[in-house]
Structures are given as structure tokens and as C-alpha cells.
Amino acid sequence: MASSCQNVEIPGKPTETGTALLETATGTIQGFAPLSQIHQHLCAFHFYADDMGRQVEAHHFCAHLNEDVRQCLIFDGPGAGARLIGVEYIVSETVFLTLPDAEKPLWHTHEFEVKGGVLFMPGVPGVVERRDLEKVCKTYGKTIHFWQVDRGDALPLGLPQIMMVLTREGQLRQDLADCVEKKFGVSFQKERENRAYMSGPEHGIHPLANATGKGLRTEIREVDLPASTTAGAGRVFT
């Protein structure tokens, strides 16, 4: 299986035989219902909401909670050793429009990603892929990354980061595009042509989505805890 276009060495010793045997036993005994609901693998690109130049390959493994809401685990690659770097929630336009206006800038659209050919389902025949992407094209997503693999972090360091997606031509780094196209044997240009008929949200892209065209940065600050909250703790970070 192809690996990520951004690779770093993770600290720690190789998994021991005893650990592997224990995992085999627990894997047989226990159920993993939430994970067994994953039905879809989407590959796309994310950039940090405060720095479009920092772009990463993002593999989404998604499950439907219902027809209007999907939840996705995001890995840096499709292989067994891929790192869990974030999560994304995908909602229909109907659900997005119910969100408070203060919340909407944290969400992004998928129309350009889909119609631009840069969001795809590895290994899935085009006819099947396009049937689902017709729906994805109309949705909104909220993405948070915990592991900044693009800067070479060996572990998830620092604050969670709000991520955004491509919204027009010329934003995707060519080296990253070339790497992914070669690795998965896809052509973004060909897919762009195949998806020209698709349409985005029925009411158009909401003006508050995509961070309203501005940058968003996650920050942390120290505040005092209310006296009634706890007797032992005097500080909290938000």
C-alpha cells in the first residue's frame, strides 16, 4: 500500500511479540462497532487555517451517522502504519444552515475539491465514485488536526489546528499534487473534466464558510478557575 507523501520516524521500539499476541486475543474477544461502520476512504488535501502554504495529504476513513452527518478519522496515509492526525465532520447543507453564525466560519465547503478533481476515492471505479461525490460536493466539513506531520513532528505536539481546504485553482502545491497523482495513478485534470456536471450547495456557498476568506489561528490562554469549581486547582487553560 502506498505511504504518505510526508514521512517522519516515530520514536519508540518495534512492537513486541507479546504485545501483538495480546492484541490478537483482545481483537478476537472485543467488538469494535464504531470502526466497523467505516465504509469509505477519501483522499484530499488540507491546509492550516492560518497558513495556506502548509498543505498535507489527508486520508479520510468515514462512516455515516445518518444521511446528513458523516464522521471521519484522518490519517496521513492509507497503510497499516499510518498516523492518526485528525478528524473531520461532514454535514449536509441543511444541517450547516442551522449552525450559529459564530460557528459557520470554522466549516469549509467541498465543492471545489470535488469538481476540481483533487478529492477522490482510491481504487474505486469512477462511475461508483462519482455517485457519492455528487453528494459530497454539496456538503460542509469541519476539520481539526492534532499531528503536524508536515513540519516533521514525530508525535502530536502543540495545539489542535483548524484546517481548511482548497477553494480555487492555483492553491494546491504542485509537488504535493504530483506525488499523490503518481502514487495513486490518478489524474486531477481528467477527474475535473469528468465532474464538470456536478453542482455545489443548493443555496450557493455560504458567505460565512471557509473562514470568510480570512485566516484562523488556534491559541491558548490562562484563566482563573471559579472558586466553586474546585478547591485544589487554581489555573485552567482554554
Curated annotation (Swiss-Prot):
Keyword check for NADP: no
Tissue occurrence: Expressed in seeds, but not in leaves or roots. Highest expression in scutellum. Detected in embryo axis and endosperm.
Cross-referenced InterPro entries: OBAP-like
A GO CC annotation given for this chain: lipid droplet
Keywords associated with the record: Lipid droplet, Lipoprotein
Location(s) in or outside the cell: Lipid droplet
Domain of life: Eukaryota
Signal peptide: none
Any Pfam family matching the protein: DUF1264
Protein family according to the UniProt entry: Belongs to the OBAP family.
Stated name of the protein: Oil body-associated protein 1A
Gene giving rise to this polypeptide: OBAP1A
